[in-house]
């Protein structure tokens, strides 16, 4: 039976990256729920298209057992993460990442996802594909120059342009 996925979308989110996951999951019968990493469910894509997520990240806390995997969909909100790290939704993001990792769930993402996984303290010894600009900031995991990397329960792609390179492995793992 296919697994259920919690998809985290920052505000703004890269629509190209987000919709690669959502469409692949839909086409393969994989259930998902989109959570806005924001104060409200209303978010935008980097290009300004308005979206309404299923819920906000605060409401995912305590429901980690309802899901088998987590996707972090990166976007233009991430380069300013440090300036907003103390916002409740970003504090919740770190909590959710730690909770999913602590339960051994699949952690999937692109661009700076590996960096945020690293910030959460959950990447010790893991190889990660991260955006070249984020690579120097990775301290616990091992940032690579690869387009995508699968290492244990971590599935990371360097950018939205390379999500497709790991999608066959992601879909296979989610269909087990």
Residue ranges of each PLM-predicted region?
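A cross-family phosphate/adenosyl-ligand binding-site feature
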Residues: 45-46, 50-53
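Active-site-adjacent pocket-lining segments in enzyme domains
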Residues: 3-19, 23-36, 40, 53-176
């Amino acid at each position: 039976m296919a697994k259920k996925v919690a998809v985290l979308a920052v505000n703004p989110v890269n629509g190209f990256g987000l919709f690669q996951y959502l469409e692949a999951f839909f086409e393969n019968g994989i259930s998902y729920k989109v959570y806005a990493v924001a104060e409200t469910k209303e978010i935008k894509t980097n290009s300004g298209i308005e979206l309404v997520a299923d819920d906000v990240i605060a409401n995912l806390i305590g429901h980690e057992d309802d899901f088998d995997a987590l996707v972090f969909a990166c976007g233009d909100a991430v380069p300013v993460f440090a300036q907003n790290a103390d916002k409740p939704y970003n504090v919740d993001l770190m909590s959710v990442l730690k909770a999913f990792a602590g339960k051994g769930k699949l952690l999937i993402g692109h661009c700076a996802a590996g960096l945020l996984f690293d910030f959460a303290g959950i990447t010790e010894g893991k190889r990660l594909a991260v955006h070249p600009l984020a690579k120097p900031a990775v301290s616990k995991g091992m940032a690579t120059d690869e387009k995508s990397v699968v290492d244990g329960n971590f599935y990371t792609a360097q950018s939205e342009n390379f999500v497709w390179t790991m999608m066959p492995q992601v879909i296979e793992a989610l269909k087990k």
